[in-house]
Swiss-Prot record:
<dbReference type="InterPro" id="IPR001865">
    <property type="entry name" value="Ribosomal_uS2"/>
</dbReference>
<keyword id="KW-0689">Ribosomal protein</keyword>
<dbReference type="Pfam" id="PF00318">
    <property type="entry name" value="Ribosomal_S2"/>
</dbReference>
<dbReference type="InterPro" id="IPR023591">
    <property type="entry name" value="Ribosomal_uS2_flav_dom_sf"/>
</dbReference>
<comment type="similarity">
    <text>Belongs to the universal ribosomal protein uS2 family.</text>
</comment>
<dbReference type="InterPro" id="IPR005706">
    <property type="entry name" value="Ribosomal_uS2_bac/mit/plastid"/>
</dbReference>
<protein>
    <recommendedName>
        <fullName>Small ribosomal subunit protein uS2</fullName>
    </recommendedName>
</protein>
<dbReference type="GO" id="GO:0022627">
    <property type="term" value="C:cytosolic small ribosomal subunit"/>
</dbReference>
<dbReference type="InterPro" id="IPR018130">
    <property type="entry name" value="Ribosomal_uS2_CS"/>
</dbReference>
<keyword id="KW-0687">Ribonucleoprotein</keyword>
<dbReference type="GO" id="GO:0003735">
    <property type="term" value="F:structural constituent of ribosome"/>
</dbReference>
<dbReference type="GO" id="GO:0006412">
    <property type="term" value="P:translation"/>
</dbReference>
Length: 255
């Protein structure tokens, strides 16, 4: 049975791609149709490819993989942080700092500085420092937490990266490829699927769509780590799903 149903995908708007003029021709095989200047993603393929991604991530988690969630645009930031945390993994949901993977030793030093400042507050050091210095330390901590808080406890370079919008996160994709780290990603109609190892054709601009797909990746991790079936609503899957349903919803949404 499918991990996710077409009904869920439709309700979350996963089928809406970008304007046709913004497409990447390499995504043609994942496009079902065009409606009012918008490409519509083939959700029958998405259902199958979510299954593939789920199994890939589940197996990685079962083998104690470190998995990094990446999504820095506003539509993805909250879901990426929440779902990575729920799965006991790590995330970057603000700007990707160049060298996060390829210059990991430098990043580790910045993380160590963040922990040092936190410890200074916890052990009472702040209380004996001048207010001006404490203010500067708090400012530094806030900035470090913003960019590195989600990977503060990441023990090593990740084994797998899950990305929302690889078109936006091209630096992260390039660093992962350079290091041979497999990338699982929500790939919209404007992106290059050739750069991604495990593709999920999906609308990466709608909050509900991002939350739905990202939550399934978190479920896969939880299942892999615990050996339990963490996903829900299997009974709603594939049985009544059809191309006709996509047409009906697409036309209804665009009237």
């Amino acid at each position: 049975m499918a991990v996710i149903s077409m009904k869920q995908l439709l309700e979350a708007g996963v089928h809406f791609g970008h304007q046709t003029r913004r497409w990447n021709p390499k995504m043609a095989k994942y496009i079902f149709t065009e409606r009012n200047g918008i490409h519509v993603i083939d959700l029958q393929q998405t259902v199958k490819m979510v299954d593939t991604a789920y199994e890939f991530v589940r197996e990685a988690a079962a083998n104690d993989a470190v998995i990094l969630f990446v999504g820095t645009k506003k539509q993805a930031a909250e879901a990426v942080a929440e779902e990575a945390t729920r799965a006991g993994q790590y995330y970057i949901n603000h700007r990707w700092l160049g060298g996060t993977l390829t210059n990991w030793n430098t990043i580790k030093k910045r993380i160590a500085r963040l922990k040092e400042i936190k410890q200074m507050e916890a052990d009472g050091t702040f209380e004996v420092l001048p207010k001006k210095e404490v203010a500067l330390l708090n400012k530094q901590r806030a900035r470090l937490e913003k960019f590195l808080g989600g990977i503060e406890d990441m023990p090593r370079i990740p084994d797998v990266i899950y990305i929302v919008d690889p078109h936006k996160e091209q630096i992260a994709v390039k660093e992962a490829k350079k290091l041979g780290i497999p990338v699982v990603a929500m790939v919209d109609t404007n992106a290059d699927p050739d750069e991604i190892d495990v593709i999920i054709p999906a609308n990466d601009d709608a909050i509900r769509a991002v939350k739905l797909i990202t939550s399934k990746m978190a479920d896969a991790i939880i299942e892999g780590k615990q050996g339990e079936d963490a996903s829900v609503d299997f009974q709603e899957a594939a049985a009544a799903d059809s191309i006709e349903e996509i047409v009906e919803v697409v036309e209804g949404d665009n009237n």
